[in-house]
UniProtKB/Swiss-Prot annotation:
GO terms for biological process: cobalamin biosynthetic process. It is found in: Cell membrane. It comes from the Archaea. Keywords: Cell membrane, Cobalamin biosynthesis, Magnesium, Membrane, Transferase, Transmembrane, Transmembrane helix. It comes from Pyrococcus abyssi (strain GE5 / Orsay). The lineage of its organism: Archaea, Methanobacteriati, Methanobacteriota, Thermococci, Thermococcales. This is Adenosylcobinamide-GDP ribazoletransferase. The gene is cobS. The chain crosses the membrane at residues 24-44, 46-66, 96-116, 117-137, 153-173, 174-194, 210-230. Belongs to the CobS family. It is a multi-pass membrane protein. One of its GO terms (cellular component) is plasma membrane. Pfam families: CobS.
Length: 232
């Protein structure tokens, strides 16, 4: 897992670029690292815990995925053919669609966390990291960037190990609180982003993966919030 950490977090560890694509199966494991501080903040219920938990999460994982979400949203929303959409996504200037997407995702996360138990951020992060693994499993790269490089190393074995890890990491939370199982539905957002990416761009790049991570995390928290309303 050490080699994949520099690509998914800001943790100052030295990873081997060549070996990283052989550790894609470890994506779900990264959620243990990225969510530990937010979990502690939410568990202690300190003032503004929902805001501080989210800030601490982005302190660990960085803002690269949020930037990818903004670029992805600009590309999705622009009118025109596939070439024009890809050009808009790669534009260095962030458009109104990108700004709107980032604001909505942040708002949904902050508001949802104020209603949810401490472990919700862990489930959301687990889904977030697993969604990127699912995106890589499509083996449909867009361009020759980091996403394409990782897809070259993606295979059935890595996906199978990743799925097993996802289940094993999710299971303890379900044992603790069976209602946490509703969080699995958050993966529907991953599927939707993958579908939109393939339909609009014809492939998946780093921006698409970032959008998957952010939208899946926010969507999972929203689903858990609604499930809480119906189960209490």
């Amino acid at each position: 897992m050490r080699n994949i950490l520099p690509f998914l977090t800001r943790i100052p560890v030295k990873g081997d670029f060549e070996k990283a694509r052989n550790e894609l199966w470890a994506f779900p494991l990264v959620s243990l690292v990225s969510s530990i501080i937010p979990i502690a903040i939410l568990y202690l219920r300190i003032p503004l815990a929902n805001v501080l938990a989210l800030l601490s999460l982005y302190f660990v994982i960085g803002l690269l995925h949020l930037d990818g979400l903004a670029d992805w949203a600009d590309g999705i929303m622009v009118k025109g053919d596939r070439e024009r959409k890809i050009k808009a996504m790669k534009d260095l200037n962030t458009g109104i669609a990108g700004v709107f997407a980032v604001v909505v995702v942040l708002f949904l996360q902050v508001y949802s966390l104020s209603m949810l138990p401490f472990y919700a951020i862990y489930i959301a992060e687990l889904n977030s990291k697993f969604s990127m693994l699912l995106g890589l499993a499509t083996k449909k790269p867009l361009g020759q960037g980091l996403g394409a490089y990782f897809m070259e190393g993606m295979n059935g074995r890595q996906l199978a190990i990743g799925v097993v890890l996802y289940v094993l990491l999710y299971l303890p939370v379900v044992i603790y609180d069976p209602s946490a199982l509703f969080g699995v539905m958050g993966l529907v957002f991953a599927w939707y982003v993958i579908r939109l990416s393939l339909e609009n761009f014809g492939g998946i790049n780093g921006d698409c993966l970032g959008a998957m991570a952010e939208i899946t995390r926010a969507g999972t928290l929203v689903i858990l919030s609604f499930s809480l309303c119906f189960t209490t």
